[in-house]
């Protein structure tokens, strides 16, 4: 498969134009006409992650956080980013990032699904796409009323986490997940009490 075939599919599912204006997503390095057979997924492209991907035989790396956020003035072996870009090019590895576009169009719904929320609404609206409101976060009802301790355990198990940090009375009852968002000095209550 050519890299552009995979990136085209990703662009249809998680379009770059859904990302925040400040974000840098999509094909960030490499030749999208390269043949790919092994894709390495990571949260961040650190030097250690890159070394592991190379050792693993990856010819494409997809990360959540882009390693390039703003303009680069030099690409050389004297900076972390420069070394990574040089290595990607020298090894012929294609590098693609999906950050806020994935947060808006994938991660929020996935997180709600994993924690068994239903009747969800978007927490912080960023746009309307194909007749559906899109944005960061979800607010919804839990499968049943439970203690905060039980909900923390549900999150921990559903997301396969080692630890979950919780603030508040662990014995208090919750029936839905609710967030308050601070935006331009205005507090938005999502109506979950």
What are the residue ranges of the model-derived segments?
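Hydrophobic structural segments
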Residues: 1-193
């Amino acid at each position: 498969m050519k890299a552009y075939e995979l990136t085209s599919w990703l662009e249809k599912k998680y379009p770059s134009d859904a990302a925040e204006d400040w974000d840098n997503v999509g094909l960030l390095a490499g030749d999208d006409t390269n043949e790919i057979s092994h894709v390495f997924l990571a949260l961040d492209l650190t030097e250690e992650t890159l070394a592991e991907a190379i050792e693993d035989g990856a010819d494409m790396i997809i990360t959540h956080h882009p390693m390039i956020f703003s303009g680069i003035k030099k690409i050389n072996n004297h900076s972390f980013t420069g070394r990574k870009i040089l290595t990607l090019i020298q090894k012929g590895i294609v590098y693609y990032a999906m950050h806020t576009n994935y947060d808006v169009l994938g991660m929020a719904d996935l997180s709600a699904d994993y924690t068994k929320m239903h009747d969800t609404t978007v927490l912080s609206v960023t746009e309307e796409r194909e007749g559906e409101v899109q944005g960061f976060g979800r607010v919804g009802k839990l499968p049943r009323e439970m203690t905060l301790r039980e909900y923390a355990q549900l999150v921990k198990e559903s997301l396969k986490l080692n630890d979950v940090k919780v603030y508040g009375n662990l014995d208090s009852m919750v029936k839905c997940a609710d967030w308050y968002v601070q935006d331009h000095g205005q507090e938005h209550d999502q109506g979950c009490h």
